Amino acid sequence: PSMVRSAAKNHRFVTILTDAADYAELIAQLAENDGATTLDFRRRMAARAYAATAAYDAAISQWFAFADQGETFPPRLATANTRAATLRYGENPHQQAALYVPQRV
């Protein structure tokens, strides 16, 4: 995770991919930009990299929190969730809402 975060931090100069599903877009970027990627693409990939490492860190945090047998409830709760759906409206019709589900790490 530290190398992924480091690459994401330096997204102005490097491209980081954390999902093989992004390979096709990377190849298109390289073809369209004379072997380079755009800053917008690098920013989007950096955001995905940080999301991936945050989910990993949350999973580790939860493992340690629940590994402590002396506590009924952990002192803090860290979760990583993914948007599953954008809902028609929130609690009231003028509000926006979305449904989030636990992310698999």
Name every feature range the model reports, one short phrase each.
Residues 21-105:
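Active-site loops and adjacent core secondary-structure elements that bind or stabilize anionic groups
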Residues 1-13, 18-22:
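Short alpha-helices
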